[in-house]
């Protein structure tokens, strides 16, 4: 019999993460690399583990992630969102705790576009009265 798999898609900024959860030992693989190798910042790795901490399922599932787009922070947020959605498939009772922790909400903040005549989205050249 095939092993149970749970899937979830997470998004944050320009990053999209496709996440698969398989019952296992808690190993996280991102783009065929270990998470410590792929994401060098420890604080971003903590973000990835938040859904497991909230639902008390640390070490229960192996995580396989395929993530594209964005940087480390956006990808970490997308992975967290995908794991939270996949955990909902594992047990729908997790919805309340995940929702209360804000892990099911898609973070809608995006980079503001650059405006013509300005140097960046809001940075203008210095104003001279005379």
Curated annotation (Swiss-Prot):
GO terms for cellular component: cytosolic small ribosomal subunit. Gene3D superfamilies: 3.30.230.10. One of its GO terms (biological process) is translation. Keywords: Ribonucleoprotein, Ribosomal protein. GO terms for molecular function: RNA binding; structural constituent of ribosome. Belongs to the universal ribosomal protein uS9 family. This is Small ribosomal subunit protein uS9. The lineage of its organism: Bacteria, Bacillati, Bacillota, Bacilli, Lactobacillales. The gene is rpsI.
């Amino acid at each position: 019999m095939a092993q149970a798999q749970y899937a979830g898609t997470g998004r944050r900024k320009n990053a999209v993460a496709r996440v698969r959860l398989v019952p296992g030992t808690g190993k996280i693989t991102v783009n065929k690399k270990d998470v410590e190798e792929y994401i060098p910042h420890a604080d971003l790795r903590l973000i990835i583990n938040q859904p497991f901490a909230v639902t008390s399922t640390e070490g229960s599932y192996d995580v396989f992630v395929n993530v594209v787009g964005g940087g480390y922070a956006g990808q970490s947020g997308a992975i967290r969102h995908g794991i939270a959605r996949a955990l909902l498939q594992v047990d729908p009772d997790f919805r309340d705790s995940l929702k209360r922790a804000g892990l099911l909400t898609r973070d809608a903040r995006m980079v503001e576009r650059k405006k013509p005549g300005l140097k960046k989205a809001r940075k203008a050249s210095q104003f001279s009265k005379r």
